[in-house]
Each structure stands twice: as structure tokens, then as C-alpha cells.
């Protein structure tokens, strides 16, 4: 008998490049069901990209193209202005790179998730969102787009015929209207594993979470993002998974 609830857990991986190491990808891949793999623009390089694709396939972890602004120096977290054609081309370029890597090992790219400043920008900016959507439609209109749950991009992408995966964050606080609390605000990040685990459980079961103002709020979740780029974060992910399993929630790929 299948568990009454299931949820996808995703994490940002493949972000090392050259001699610089970011995160503990092998450990995270043992825990999550989806891997957002950097495509070389905000982080990662050709060697790391292929290595991470191989590691994800070996664990039957779903592979996502983690596209970003062309900004290695700023780790893709700096706001940038783009001509429409350039953002379309760079989106195609990045997805194409990871698709090629996946093809060489008999794997497939199953979705696209923007990174950092691009993720935040297209959530609310119709013009940049349109460029990403256009690129995906040109390349593979069947490829789902993972975006912030409840953001304007959701309806925009659906109206253009894309499948949308709505994402929430276990370790981030939410406002009473279901938006992420800015990282500049005190209390924006949950460092207590138990708090993050309770929030993840609510997302997975359709329950309400507690906003930063103490109000109950329900946020739709097809996938939950977890971070595992340091030992403390890995422990948080393990606590989340233990809590989900204790409440009969299965961790598995989003449909």
C-alpha cells in the first residue's frame, strides 16, 4: 500500500568549479529525489557538470538544469538586465549543455530550475520570464519549469503551455500572504532543524505553516528545496526526511 502523501525534495548541486569546492554533493544525492545541477554560468564547470550528472543517474535522482545569469563572480545572485535575445540564447545554451552531458551517460534532463537572482526576477518580471519560457519552448516544450510557488510566473508559464513545478523552501520563513521573507530581514531563515521539518511536513501534507507574523498560511508545494552545503545543513535535511517518514510521507520525484 502506498503512503497517503508524497513529496519531491530538491537541492542545488554541481556548483564547484576548478579548485573551488562548494557543498557535499555525494551526501546530498543520497537524500534527495531531484538535483538542480549548475550549468556553468553562475557556478560549475564542464567536469563538475558531467560528474554530477553521472552521480545523480547512479542514484536514480531526477536531473534538473539549474540555469542562471552569466555571473560566476557573483554566484548568480546579482540582479542583471538582459536583452531578450541574449537571455533566450543563454538559457538554450545552458540547458543544451546539461542535455548533452546527460545524453552521453544515458540520462535525461527532466526539468529546469533557474538560480538565484534569475529565479527571483522571473518570479515577478514578465519580460525576463518570457525570455526563459521562449527558450524552453524552442528547445523542448515538454520540459517542466520549477518556480516559486504562487508567483506570477506560474500562471504566465502555464498560459504558454509549459508544465510548472511549484516549489517551496523548508528553511525559509514566509509572510502571511505566502511570499518568502527577504533574507535581509531577521528570522528569514530557519536554522532549527525541527522548525524546518515541521514546515516541510505541512507543505507535503497540504497543511498550513506559521508565517513570520504568527498567522497560519497554506502554500502549495510540488517540490521542497533543501540545502546541504554544510554539515549543519545536511543534518537539517536528515531531520526533515526522518520527520516526513515518521508521518508516512514518501520522498519521491514530482510527477
UniProtKB/Swiss-Prot annotation:
Reported EC number(s) for this entry are 3.5.2.9
Gene (UniProt): pxpA
Q: Which NCBIfam families match?
A: PRK05406.1-3, PRK05406.1-5
Organism listed in the record:
Corynebacterium efficiens (strain DSM 44549 / YS-314 / AJ 12310 / JCM 11189 / NBRC 100395)
**Function, in words:** Catalyzes the cleavage of 5-oxoproline to form L-glutamate coupled to the hydrolysis of ATP to ADP and inorganic phosphate.
Q: Which PANTHER family match?
A: 5-OXOPROLINASE SUBUNIT A (PTHR30292:SF0), UNCHARACTERIZED PROTEIN YBGL-RELATED (PTHR30292)
BP GO terms, sorted: carbohydrate metabolic process
- Protein family (similarity comment): Belongs to the LamB/PxpA family.
Q: What is this protein called?
A: 5-oxoprolinase subunit A
Reactions the enzyme catalyzes: 5-oxo-L-proline + ATP + 2 H2O = L-glutamate + ADP + phosphate + H(+)
Instruction: Fill in the subunit field for this protein.
Output: Forms a complex composed of PxpA, PxpB and PxpC.
Record key words, sorted: ATP-binding, Hydrolase, Nucleotide-binding
- GO terms assigned for molecular function: 5-oxoprolinase (ATP-hydrolyzing) activity; ATP binding
Amino acid at each position: 500500500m502506498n503512503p497517503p502523501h508524497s513529496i519531491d525534495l530538491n537541492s542545488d548541486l554541481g556548483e564547484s568549479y576548478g579548485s573551488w569546492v562548494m557543498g557535499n554533493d555525494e551526501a546530498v544525492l543520497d537524500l534527495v529525489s531531484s538535483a538542480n545541477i549548475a550549468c556553468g554560468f553562475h557556478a560549475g564547470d564542464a567536469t563538475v557538470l558531467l560528474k554530477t550528472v553521472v552521480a545523480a543517474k547512479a542514484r536514480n535522482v531526477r536531473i534538473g538544469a539549474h540555469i542562471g545569469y552569466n555571473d560566476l563572480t557573483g554566484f548568480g545572485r546579482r540582479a542583471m538586465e538582459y536583452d531578450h535575445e541574449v537571455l533566450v540564447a543563454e538559457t538554450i545554451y545552458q540547458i543544451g549543455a546539461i542535455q548533452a552531458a546527460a545524453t552521453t551517460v544515458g540520462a535525461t534532463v527532466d526539468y529546469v530550475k533557474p538560480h538565484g537572482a534569475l529565479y527571483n526576477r522571473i518570479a515577478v518580471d514578465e519580460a525576463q520570464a518570457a525570455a526563459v519560457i521562449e527558450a524552453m519552448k524552442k528547445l523542448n516544450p515538454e520540459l517542466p519549469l520549477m518556480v516559486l510557488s504562487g508567483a506570477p510566473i506560474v500562471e504566465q508559464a502555464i498560459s504558454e503551455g509549459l508544465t510548472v513545478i511549484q516549489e517551496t523552501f523548508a528553511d525559509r520563513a514566509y509572510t502571511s500572504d505566502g511570499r518568502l521573507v527577504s533574507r535581509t530581514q531577521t528570522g528569514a531563515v530557519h536554522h532549527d532543524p525541527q522548525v524546518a521539518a515541521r514546515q516541510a511536513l505541512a507543505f507535503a501534507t497540504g497543511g498550513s505553516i506559521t508565517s513570520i507574523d504568527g498567522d497560519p498560511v497554506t502554500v502549495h508545494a510540488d517540490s521542497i528545496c533543501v540545502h546541504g552545503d554544510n554539515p549543519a545543513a545536511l543534518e537539517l535535511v536528515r531531520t526533515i526526511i526522518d520527520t516526513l517518514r515518521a508521518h508516512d510521507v514518501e520522498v519521491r520525484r514530482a510527477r
